[in-house]
Amino acid sequence: MEKLKRKIAEQGTVLSDEVLKVDSFLNHQIDPELMLAVGEEFASLFREEGVTKIVTIESSGIAPAVMAGLKLGVPVVFARKRQSLTLTENLLTASVYSFTKKTESTVAVSASHLSKDDKVLIIDDFLANGQAAKGLVSIIEQAGAKVCGIGIVIEKSFQTGREELENLGIRVESLARIASLAGGKVTFLQEVGS
């Protein structure tokens, strides 16, 4: 998705060979027009899958997930990272490791929001090692629902996340695939060798 790649090139900050900061448009401040375009792209990619729900993880996955939900006409459920007074029973949970934060947390979704009849699209802001997405897959499977794909805004293709998810037989679509962050420069996958 060229609009997203331009935004990454113009406003993204490479903090290390493994960390890209995009807080000016995705995971702190949000660019609504860009997120609408992201949602439209995900809707186009997954429209034929018969999606009935979108699942994401708080908080950076919520904006792209909501826009995709709007375009697909389906509800969005987000897995909570923190215990809530209103989210205490009948929970589907999974343990996930955050590559960026270097922490493990338990995420939860109320079982009342997913059913065995749901066809679920997972959407998240980043794909690195795939642990967050695998946690969401586990939650969806606990509900007896079907994962029909995973939509990622920015994929760090130099890490193992895509391979791990595809090895589970899951379709992964990423709107921007980064081959490298070496030398403080973002190199997109199709630029390699050109």
Swiss-Prot record:
Instruction: Please give the Gene3D superfamilies that the UniProt record associates with this protein.
Output: 3.40.50.2020
Where xanthine is bound, by residue?
A: 20, 27, 156
Q: Which InterPro entries match?
A: PRibTrfase_dom, PRTase-like, Pur/Pyrimidine_PRTase, Xanthine_PRibTrfase
This one is known as: Xanthine phosphoribosyltransferase
Residue ranges of the TM segments: none
Q: What are the annotated disulfide bridges?
A: none
Could you tell me which HAMAP family the record lists for this protein?
Answer: XPRTase
